[in-house]
């Protein structure tokens, strides 16, 4: 969808949260000094004061906002923060950037037998999954390789940083949205399990096995109950045991679980072994290891991810937290060199914004996804970012990444019957006690 440059746009940003900081810069007086009556009435009916809301609405190119309410108060933007991460990624990495995954060796490759130390090094590809892995392994088979033996060493050193408790945000460490970044990310760390009953037999299976993962099935037969719960126990090293408990009656449908319980390297190793032997009829006798790739290796194959432009709608439109975290560390590595860390990522984002004339003194960014209680930015500065991006060189990619009102992404079920349907391009944000939305709306006479 190409957005024509000559159409008048309205830009809006609104974030609801408890304030923490406020800026003191002088702002232009809004054309409408008060919030519209409809908004005030809605706030009143919800039991919320106008003090708890910030709003900023401005016509693109206009020196004055239409509405400015608590616009300089620093709020928690929730997932609206992904706009900053995406904007800086476009400016630093570029829309055509693709993340490599390298297969190298300092062993031998003779007669189709790849032996010795074989290294798989990741550079933070957000989208590397089973489908991409299968494609990569197919390329090896096409090169005549039929046997992998020795040691398969997984290199995730391109990212680093302090160990983060994935449950620190909300006490749910195994929820897929809390999955932490990894330079060798695989399937967004997601492991999928299915509990099913056929007759008197109850089974628990996984489509994403890992050689360090053990499944314990304690589900019992029942006449009515369909309740199944899980518990996770970590053992020595990287061993993980998941216990499924509860009851399944004959009438129960299959119960599906998606969890972030294993690290990408272990899951990838098991997937490689399965695909190589079961699907590609190859031979596999390689031990699992994790380590850094040495200098004296030769390239066997390089796989490339989809481009940033292709991935950005998943980050923004669908509000993918894992990919946003990957982007932030990639930005940090690009600006300050490897390894990519949260600190480098946050500093790189702030540095790039300043170079674009976007000085946000209240900005606090933790992980690039907005899944944070620490993050802060004002609605006025979100609007300044939107204006800058609209006039920037990547406007079409930027706008295509946003959720269209009433049509797709996080806006698919919102504003479906309003005049804004199909004409609004938004990024939404939701946390406990936080609701936010920012983006663009075509004027009544606008066309797309």
Regions found by a protein language model. Name each.
Residues 68-88, 92:
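Short active-site loop at a secondary-structure junction
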Residues 12-22:
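Bacterial N-terminal signal peptides
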Residues 28-43, 92-360, 445:
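Conserved serine DD-peptidase/penicillin-binding transpeptidase domain
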Residues 63, 82-89, 152, 184, ...:
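Residue-level preference for non-acidic, small/hydrophobic
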Residues 2-12:
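Bacterial N-terminal signal peptides that target proteins for export
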Residues 44-69:
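A short, well-structured edge-of-sheet supersecondary motif
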Residues 65-69, 129, 328-448:
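Small-residue-rich helix-loop
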Residues 23-27:
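Sec/Tat signal peptide C-region and signal peptidase I cleavage site
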């Amino acid at each position: 969808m190409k957005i024509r440059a000559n159409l008048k746009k309205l830009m809006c940003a609104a974030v609801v949260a408890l304030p923490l900081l406020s800026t003191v810069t002088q702002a232009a007086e809004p054309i409408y000094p008060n919030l519209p009556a409809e908004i005030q009435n809605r706030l009143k009916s919800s039991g919320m004061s106008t003090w708890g809301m910030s709003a900023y609405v401005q016509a693109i190119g206009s020196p004055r906002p239409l509405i400015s309410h608590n616009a300089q108060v620093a709020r928690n933007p929730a997932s609206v923060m992904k706009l900053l991460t995406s904007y800086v990624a476009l400016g630093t990495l570029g829309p055509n950037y693709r993340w490599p995954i390298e297969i190298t060796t300092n062993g031998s490759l003779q007669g189709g037998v790849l032996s010795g130390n074989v290294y798989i090094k990741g550079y933070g590809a957000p989208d590397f999954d089973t489908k991409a892995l299968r494609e990569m392994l197919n390329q090896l088979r096409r090169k005549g390789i039929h046997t992998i033996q020795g040691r398969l060493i997984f290199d995730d050193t391109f990212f680093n940083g302090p160990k983060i408790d994935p449950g620190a945000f909300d006490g749910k460490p195994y929820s897929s949205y809390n999955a932490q970044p990894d330079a060798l990310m695989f399937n967004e760390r997601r492991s999928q399990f299915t509990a099913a009953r056929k007759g008197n037999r109850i089974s628990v299976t996984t489509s994403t096995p890992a050689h360090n993962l053990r499944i314990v099935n304690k589900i019992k037969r029942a006449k009515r109950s369909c309740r199944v719960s899980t518990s996770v126990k970590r053992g020595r090293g990287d061993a993980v045991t998941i216990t499924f408990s509860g009851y399944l009656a004959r009438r129960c449908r299959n119960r599906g679980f998606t969890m972030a319980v294993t690290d990408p390297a272990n899951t990838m190793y098991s997937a490689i072994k399965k695909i190589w032997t079961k699907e590609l009829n190859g031979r596999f006798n390689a031990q699992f290891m994790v380590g850094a790739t040495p200098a004296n290796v030769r390239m066997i194959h390089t796989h490339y991810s989809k481009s940033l432009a292709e991935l950005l709608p998943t980050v923004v439109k669908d509000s993918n937290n894992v990919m946003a975290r990957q982007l932030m560390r990639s930005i940090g590595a690009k600006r300050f060199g490897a390894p990519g860390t949260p600190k480098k990522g946050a500093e790189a984002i702030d540095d790039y914004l300043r170079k674009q004339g976007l000085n946000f003194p209240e900005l606090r960014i933790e992980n690039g996804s907005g899944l944070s209680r620490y993050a802060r930015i004002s609605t006025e500065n979100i609007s300044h970012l939107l204006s800058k991006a609209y006039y920037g060189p990547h406007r079409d990619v930027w706008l295509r990444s946003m959720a269209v009102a009433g049509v797709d992404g996080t806006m698919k079920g919102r504003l479906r019957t309003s005049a804004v349907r199909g004409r609004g391009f938004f990024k939404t944000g939701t946390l406990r006690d936080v609701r936010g939305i920012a983006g663009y709306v075509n004027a009544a006479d606008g066309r797309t």
